[in-house]
Amino acid sequence: MTGHAHPMTLAIARISEIFSDLGFDTVDGPELESEWYNFDALNVPKDHPARDMQDTFWIKDRKGLNKFNEEVGYVLRTHTSNMQIRTMEKYVQEKREFPLAICCPGKVFRNEATDATHEAQFHQVEMLYVGKDA
């Protein structure tokens, strides 16, 4: 019995390969994420609709502390931008040289009604390039 890779898996692999050829590193990050990385570090206001229960899967009874020692909740990530923040932090901590060029593919989750064009879990790929002449 043989199997085949899912078309989405093939598409993400090909996109990652193309951007790798252009000098981008493919990065991965947690699907269960603190609201700090998912919202706060990206300047998403506390009252933004994306934070509502009807848009985001919040994890009940799971709390942690952010880097400022403030209590934060946890969510299933709503985008792959959390990987951008984590990678930029790593670059600063490790005093790495810029430019920073990353490809961030991954599953994301939205608490919404499913139909022919909407699903609670889907894939997203985003790129980030940071440099002096970017």
Which residues are covered by each model-predicted region?
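TRNA-recognition modules of translation machinery and tRNA-sensing kinases, especially anticodon-binding
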Residues: 1-134
